[in-house]
């Protein structure tokens, strides 16, 4: 990775910032696309801003992409997206513009590259008759967010067939770790536990899997180095499911919280997926990927980080039925 020219869209976001910091540490020459220049105040990248090139561009606007059309990159990681599943029902146009049009624009008007890695989502699977979710499963997206992600994936595949350029689609499953938004389930549970705020959840019998962010970044980097690049979509996930009620209890315990746990206080959302976790055979066999940080160790690291910065987060009111 040393001295490679890398472009990261969404590089100031949660996963993107972890990827950017890792790339810088490996000696890559990293450019980061941000929507607004003011994002340089973002603490996620404060330690590496002097080592990255910042490009201000709104990927939904073709004109803003022309400024770096003549550049060339070894790898483009496309992570910029509208990322909240529940809110995508309230902001359909924004979700689709950010996840479909922005992706199409970047693929059509991007600078030259040797490899393009598109970040899709496990949400594209939607309702499935069996678990774990395999790459061979037919996607059945059930939210505007998931529809947008799958549409972006289809466009990327089309572009790959059209140009014969290596475009890889990766479907990471739920990811957590330091610097994550308080609107995600694990940070919300941690912050409420640390503040001893009552925690209300659904019955919590639905299952998810959660992957510590460093493990996901490992998978991204393996995809960037693999020769020849895989032609098929790849799941990145641990294949370990946990019930949401057990997740809440686990975090409550690890935080030593005095919060009141109100399991079952909230209804499930109408489009609830009852079981959702990765089939990771391809990641294990093709990439030789394995999670290096266990789920519990990842939780402990995350709790330690949020404990340091808990005072900087808002008091949360969003219900834990919006996974």
Spans of features found by a protein language model:
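Hydrophobic "lid"/C-terminal helical patch
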Residues: 19, 189, 220-224, 248-251, ...
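Residue-level signal for the nucleotide or nucleotide-sugar donor/cofactor binding architecture
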Residues: 60, 90, 98, 136, ...
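C-terminal "lid/loop" region of Rossmann-like NAD(P)-dependent oxidoreductases
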Residues: 203, 231-234, 243-248, 256-275, ...
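Glycine/proline-rich active-site loop of Rossmann-fold NAD(P)-dependent oxidoreductases
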Residues: 150, 166, 175-188, 195-197, ...
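N-terminal Rossmann-like NAD(P)+-binding domain of SDR-like oxidoreductases, especially those catalyzing
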Residues: 1-175, 309
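Conserved C-terminal active-site "lid" loop/helix of NAD(P)H-dependent oxidoreductases
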Residues: 213, 267-290, 297-301
């Amino acid at each position: 990775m040393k001295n490679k020219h890398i472009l990261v869209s969404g590089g100031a976001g949660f996963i993107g910032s972890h990827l950017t910091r890792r790339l810088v540490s490996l000696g890559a020459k990293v450019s980061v696309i941000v929507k607004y220049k003011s994002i340089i105040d973002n603490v996620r990248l404060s330690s590496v801003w002097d080592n990255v090139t910042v490009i201000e561009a709104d990927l939904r606007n073709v004109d803003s992409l022309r400024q770096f059309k003549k550049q060339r990159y070894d790898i483009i990681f496309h992570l910029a997206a509208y990322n909240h599943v529940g809110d995508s029902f309230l902001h359909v146009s924004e979700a689709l513009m950010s996840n479909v049009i922005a992706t199409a624009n970047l693929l059509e008007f991007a600078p030259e590259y040797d490899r393009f890695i598109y970040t899709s989502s496990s949400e594209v699977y939607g309702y499935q008759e069996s678990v774990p979710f395999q790459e061979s499963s037919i996607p059945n997206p059930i939210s505007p967010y998931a529809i947008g992600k799958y549409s972006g994936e289809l466009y990327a595949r089309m572009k790959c067939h059209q140009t014969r350029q290596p475009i890889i689609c990766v479907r990471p499953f739920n990811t957590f770790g330091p610097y994550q938004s308080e609107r995600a389930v694990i940070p919300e549970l941690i912050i409420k536990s640390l503040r001893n705020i009552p925690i209300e959840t659904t019955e919590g019998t639905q299952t998810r899997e959660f992957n510590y962010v460093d493990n996901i970044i490992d998978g991204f980097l393996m995809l960037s180095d693999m020769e020849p690049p895989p032609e098929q979509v790849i799941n990145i996930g641990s294949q370990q499911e946990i019930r949401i009620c057990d997740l809440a209890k686990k975090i409550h315990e690890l935080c030593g919280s005095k919060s009141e746990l109100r399991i079952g206080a909230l209804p499930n959302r109408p489009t609830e997926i009852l079981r959702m976790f990765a089939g990771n055979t391809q990641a294990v066999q093709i990439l030789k990927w394995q999670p290096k940080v266990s789920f519990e160790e990842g939780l402990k690291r995350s709790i330690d980080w949020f404990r340091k910065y808990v005072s900087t987060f808002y008091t949360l009111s969003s219900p834990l039925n919006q996974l």
